[in-house]
């Protein structure tokens, strides 16, 4: 009779996932600090990365060390930002954002993933026009819709989207207004459950059958690469069982 994964096996998998998430956050903190300085009060990108670290139970000491390495107070690795674009099976557009200390390694890994899963890499700008860059502040069900909407508009948000299926609400902003809107909402006691600057597709593409399997395989493979920070696509997530 077969047995499921052991408790130790599940714990090891959970620890590995947590370690990968921490690595991504540390890299983002490092790049943000190098680009905009080590003071999160004057560096919205750094503050966003640190907020993500705190919500993931990362210690402040770990984050401070990452900042000091980036600002030259401690010796550390320098990472650069690179973005790759391409197509998954079914014409699904994919954007892959990376932070790397070895561009040659990273592009080889990303290209291998596309090739292995039946996709192909494109040139810069080949799919980015299908997406919008925007800030998203997500609020769980239970928050007063009118109060949040009024506060968001006053703070400079572009739109407020309510999801009737679960009552969740997203506040959408221009990227350069993200920090301003977030700070204004938090100051009034409206703390988002999640906040980030991201890409959203203008239109989703539905896939099914073997194509859906291959698209999911590619997205998962890209997400698992050490140098990959974020993966965006215009696939209809419902088609992937998400």
Swiss-Prot record:
Pfam families: TACO1_YebC_N, Transcrip_reg
Name of the protein in question: Probable transcriptional regulatory protein XAC3151
Keyword Transcription belongs to the record: yes
GO terms under biological process: regulation of DNA-templated transcription
Keyword terms, alphabetized: Cytoplasm, DNA-binding, Transcription, Transcription regulation
Domain of life, source organism: Bacteria
A GO cellular-component term linked to this record: cytosol
């Amino acid at each position: 009779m077969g047995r499921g994964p052991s408790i130790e096996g599940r714990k090891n998998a959970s620890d590995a996932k947590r370690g990968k998430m921490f690595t991504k956050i540390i890299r983002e903190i490092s790049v943000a600090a190098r680009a905009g300085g080590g003071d999160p009060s004057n560096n919205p990108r750094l503050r966003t990365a640190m907020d993500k670290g705190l919500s993931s139970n990362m210690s402040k000491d770990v984050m401070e060390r990452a900042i000091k390495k980036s600002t030259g107070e401690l010796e550390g690795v320098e990472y650069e930002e690179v973005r790759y674009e391409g197509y998954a099976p079914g014409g699904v557009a994919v954007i892959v954002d990376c932070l790397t200390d070895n561009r040659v390694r990273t592009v080889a890994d990303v290209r291998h993933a596309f090739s292995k899963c039946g996709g192909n890499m494109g040139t810069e700008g080949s799919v980015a026009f299908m997406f919008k860059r925007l800030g998203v502040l997500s609020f769980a069900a239970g928050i007063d819709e009118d109060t949040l909407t009024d506060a968001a508009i006053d703070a400079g948000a572009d739109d407020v989207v309510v999801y009737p299926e679960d009552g969740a609400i997203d506040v959408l902003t221009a990227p350069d207004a993200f920090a301003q809107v977030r700070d204004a909402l938090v100051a009034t006691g409206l703390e988002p459950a999640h906040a980030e600057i991201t890409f959203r597709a203008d239109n989703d593409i539905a896939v099914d059958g073997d194509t859906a399997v291959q698209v999911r395989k590619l997205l998962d493979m890209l997400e698992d690469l050490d140098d990959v920070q974020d993966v965006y696509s215009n696939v209809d997530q419902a088609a992937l069982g998400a």
